[in-house]
Every structure is written in C-alpha cells, then in structure tokens.
Amino acid sequence: MNFARMENQDLSGKTVLIREDLNVPVQNGKISNDARLQSSLPTIKLALEKGAAVLVCSHLGRPTEGDYEEKYSLQPVADYLSEHLNQPVRLDKTYTEQEVTVAPGDVVLLENVRFNVGEKKNSDSLSQHYADLCDVFVMDAFGTAHRAQASTEGVIQAAAKAGKVVCAGPLLAAELDALDKALHKPKKPLVAIVGGSKVSTKLDVLISLAKICDQIIVGGGIANTFIAAQGHSVGASLYEAEMIDTAKQIMQQTDILLPKNVVVADKNQINFDDFLNSLESATPIHRSIEQVGEDEMILDIASEGAEHIFEAVKNAATILWNGPVGVFEVEAFSEGTRLLSEAVKDSAGFSIAGGGDTLAAIHKFNVEDGVSYMSTGGGAFLEFVEGKTLPAVAALEANHSK
C-alpha cells in the first residue's frame, strides 16, 4: 500500500490536524472504556515531539447534525487527554465559525465533528473548512476510514488540492500494514476464525476468505447454519435455512472446520428479552452435533471433539480472527472461545483480531500478549477483509505523489 506516513514528515512549526477515532463510551460524563484513547496517544505525542501545533478532531456517538447535545460533547475526552499528555487540552467549540489559535507544543481538541452540518454527507464546504485549519492533515482513524465523510475523505481531497501534506498516522498505518500482511502477503497456512449470529451479515467476508484461506473456523449462529448444511438438526438454535445452499458452496471452496460436539441449553430455560442473564441459570448440556434435541439451542462448541480446531489454530502461520464461537459472556458457554483464544496465544504465527466482541473476549481471557495485532476498527476491519475500498485510504493513496 502506497501512502505518505506522518513519521516521515517535517512537522516543526506547522499546524497539524489529526483525525482520530475517539468515539468512546461515556456515561454521566465518565469514560468507561479508554482503549481508543490509549491507541491515539502515541500519534499525538509524536506530533508534539516533532514540534507541531496540534489540532485533534473526532466524532462521538450519533448526534443530530446542527444540534449541540452535551451528552455527545468531547469535553470528557479533552479532560482525559489533558491528564495523559500532562498538559492542558482545550476543547474548541467555535472552530467552524472562527480561526483556531494553537501554538507549537499545544494541543486543541475540536468539538464533535458530527455536530457540524454536512459532516456525514461529505460537504465540500465543510471539508474545505477543515483543510483551511491546518498545514498538514493526518488521517489516523481506521475505525472511520470506510466512511466518506467531511472529516475523513473530504478533508484529504481538499487539503491535497490546496497543496498541503496529507498522510496516515502511525495507528492507521499499523492497521493497514497488519491487514495487508494477513490478507495480501500471508504466510501459509492461513486460518480464519469467523463468528457471529448470521451467515448473511458475514457472507462477503466468508466468500473473500474462502478464496485465500486454507481453513476457516466458524462459530456462533454462523456455525449452526453450516452444521445444518451438513444435514444435522440444530434444534431451536439460531440459523438461516435460506443460507444453507450458500454454506454448501463455501464448503466446496475451502476447508470449513466445525465442532463434533456442542454445548446446548433448553430454550424453555431462556428468556429472550433478558438473554444473557437468563443463560446464567440455564443448564449446559454437551451433545454430539448429530444429537441436538428440537428444543435445544447450540450456545458454544464443546472442547471434546474440537481438538482439530485448536490444533489448526496452533499450527497456523497466519490467523485472522473476527467473532467469538460461543456466548462467551456466560461462564457455562465460554469454554470454546477461551480455548480458541488460548490456541491463538500459543500459535507462533502472525495473528490479527478485529471486532468489538472479539476484543472483549481477548481481554476477558487475558491473551492480549499472544495476539500480534488487535484492530481498533469494526466495520472498517470487515470491509477491508471483504476487499472493499476504504474511501479515506483510497484518498491517501491517490494523493501520495501530489
């Protein structure tokens, strides 16, 4: 992939606008998960070390464009950055109306870009306004790289047209390098783990991976559809009957690894309006995939008869992981995902993991140190795996030589 990188730019005395993904959960003014903020700090610190005057922008939540709502304000993020950068970080709320004053060595956080009319529609005028704020634009938000919006793709085009430097920040570059290594230059065997509730939502991912993977491990509702495609009853389990023919086609293209045994629970013990809490008191039962009862729901893969799955992961040279293989939030149905995460950790291969549930499982089972790269992107991660063009990345590549 060919794009300019921030670490190679002369930023001394220049005003640098960094688009980060600071979209973190905030409850009552408190940040409950700071993972994205932690990931953004090295980029901001590097810009400061290079002598830049730093502007940072991001979205938070889904406010109504044109309306200020305090619950979507980035003020808690500004306070967090102040604490972790050991210097004041001012939140600027008037940057769309007047010039922003920032000196080299200082950091100013621009208020939520989604308050601005035209942000989501990639307004030319708003994109130009963002570009006018800076000498150098740094795209560092992989999590929004798949969206053509004013603060992602639009500003890149506007800044480049004005002859300004547009480049990828270290976080975005690392994401793209890791995905490129896993998908375009993988060492073999390449094994993918794809979990989730529906084949239909991951169909493009499965089709793309079937072309390049030596083996694919499927979990969750996706696995149920593949089990049904083998002619087995999945009882009351979540599955998609209309996707069975598609599952059969995918099974002809690559080696789909399925468990021989599963962990089920009686559907009558489950309150679907309070799913996770009701599972805490449900009785786990181990079944062969050939013996699932009509009132039973598959909720995890069983460790017995899954040795071939864990061995495939341990022996892989490249692992791509998106999605747990069971309801790992509940102890009785977490063993499959736990053993799988430990297999990833024990593998000597290069591993990349993406998706909120996947990262939550990695943290729960304390295998962070055993995963080569954890992607901060959700939708962007999936779209890259599907082979789709990420607008912000395409804009960086198109303007690299300009």
From Swiss-Prot:
GO cellular component: cytosol
One of the GO biological process terms: gluconeogenesis
Residues that coordinate or bind ATP: 202, 329, 355-358
Compartment(s): Cytoplasm
Presence of the UniProt keyword Kinase in the record: yes
Enzyme class: transferase
Amino-acid positions noted as binding substrate in the UniProt annotation, renumbered to this chain: 21-23, 36, 59-62, 114, 147
A Pfam family the protein falls into: PGK
InterPro entries cross-referenced by the UniProt entry: Phosphoglycerate_kinase, Phosphoglycerate_kinase_CS, Phosphoglycerate_kinase_N, Phosphoglycerate_kinase_sf
MF annotations from Gene Ontology: ADP binding; ATP binding; phosphoglycerate kinase activity
Family from the record: Belongs to the phosphoglycerate kinase family.
Protein name: Phosphoglycerate kinase
Organism of provenance: Psychrobacter sp. (strain PRwf-1)
Lineage of producing organism: Bacteria, Pseudomonadati, Pseudomonadota, Gammaproteobacteria, Moraxellales
